[in-house]
Amino acid sequence: MIDINLIREKPDYVKERLATRDKELVSLVDKVLELDKRRREIIKRLEALRSERNKLSKEIGKLKREGKDTTEIQNRVKELKEEIDRLEEELRKVEEELKNTLLWIPNLPHPSVPVGEDEKDNVEVRRWGEPRKFDFEPKPHWEIGERLGILDFKRGAKLSGSRFTVIAGWGARLERALINFMLDLHTKKGYKEICPPHLVKPEILIGTGQLPKFEEDLYKCERDNLYLIPTAEVPLTNLYREEILKEENLPIYLTAYTPCYRREAGAYGKDIRGIIRQHQFDKVELVKIVHPDTSYDELEKLVKDAEEVLQLLGLPYRVVELCTGDLGFSAAKTYDIEVWFPSQNKYREISSCSNCEDFQARRMNTRFKDSKTGKNRFVHTLNGSGLAVGRTLAAILENYQQEDGSVVVPEVLRDYVGTDVIRPE
């Protein structure tokens, strides 16, 4: 959530930054200013009416002691009460609308973020590794997986419908190996491993910015008013909701493996085949809760931590800085890491690493006590995939495929998997 004081004091700046995302967002700022003005007018009027009521109440007591008639003043007090009740209800509605409007406004892009409309305006930062030159036509991962008997799309559809897959045999072992490898790597770097709930309350999703804007993309358990998590970022970041942290305990590094559940409401026709875009997929998440002064240094380190997974797996990739029009709702700055897919002859996103600054912290009310000023300040929150497991598995199948249909297991995974090569069963 954007600081309403910033909107009050620098409305033109806020509008300018939001317009780099989408010009239509400017109208939300005007609505906030209008509601905020009305709110303050009501509060001022209420204070005046309450003051008058208090004075008259004292006057009634005085007149009664003197044995004088108080009918006229009592009638006025009754009128004041009715007016105060009406204004208090109006204030409640205005404040609710103001809060809801603020919840729909995305984060302000950091000034360093390149201005652009969509992914075509993203800026490549660096590449690592050389894409393998095949002496045969590389097959797509879904074809490789089906031939190996490790990806079963028909049975996945039989069980749950489209965009669900059964991963079996050596594929299941490879999936588990990737999860353990990623968690082992991150915990050695100081990330604390967490096993969070997969069902969360609505306010938890409001905290990280999925609600209210992205409700259509979430799975909801109506009877219990709980949502399946779309990413472990949601429970991990909210662990410190409504808390005041000690400055000396920052930074906090967290990691978790969870399945993620997404309706993919806006993905019709995209990545229909394979396991690139699923309703349920595994992911290892990285979350940082840090001091505001260090958050951009922490972002660069976060990207490096995600990159190291791909480097150790020997998978070629590139790092891309997202432009303003392609930024996620809660992010002030984001780097995407894209891994090479030979069958598509292009890089595909496998990790997104973002600094949300204090945007999520304001929604969660997560603060720390500043040792210099003694005042409470909002923390900065960061998150990144470390990595999306299914996409990593797909990238391994494609980059390590052999002409005979087998797949070589990356060296760092062999002890986890228990074999050097996966062959057709």
Swiss-Prot record:
Main subcellular localisation: cytoplasm
Gene3D superfamilies hit by this protein: Bira Bifunctional Protein, Domain 2, Serine-tRNA synthetase, tRNA binding domain
EC numbers: 6.1.1.11
Annotated keywords: Aminoacyl-tRNA synthetase, ATP-binding, Cytoplasm, Ligase, Nucleotide-binding, Protein biosynthesis
GO cellular component: cytoplasm
Single biological process term from Gene Ontology: selenocysteine biosynthetic process
Associated pathway: Aminoacyl-tRNA biosynthesis; selenocysteinyl-tRNA(Sec) biosynthesis; L-seryl-tRNA(Sec) from L-serine and tRNA(Sec): step 1/1
Binding sites annotated in the UniProt record for ATP: R262, R263, E264, E349, I350, S351, S352
InterPro entries: aa-tRNA-synt_IIb, aa-tRNA-synth_II, aa-tRNA-synth_II/BPL/LPL, Ser-tRNA-ligase_type_1, Ser-tRNA-synth_1_N, SerRS_1_N_sf, SerRS_core, tRNA-bd_arm
Compartments where located: Cytoplasm
Binding site for L-serine: T231, A232, E233, E285, S385
HAMAP family referenced in this protein's UniProt entry, alphabetically: Ser_tRNA_synth_type1
Subunit structure: Homodimer. The tRNA molecule binds across the dimer.
Domain remark text: Consists of two distinct domains, a catalytic core and a N-terminal extension that is involved in tRNA binding.
Family that this chain belongs to: Belongs to the class-II aminoacyl-tRNA synthetase family. Type-1 seryl-tRNA synthetase subfamily.
Physiological role: Catalyzes the attachment of serine to tRNA(Ser). Is also able to aminoacylate tRNA(Sec) with serine, to form the misacylated tRNA L-seryl-tRNA(Sec), which will be further converted into selenocysteinyl-tRNA(Sec).
Protein name: Serine--tRNA ligase
Biological source species: Aquifex aeolicus (strain VF5)
Biological classification of the source: Bacteria, Pseudomonadati, Aquificota, Aquificia, Aquificales
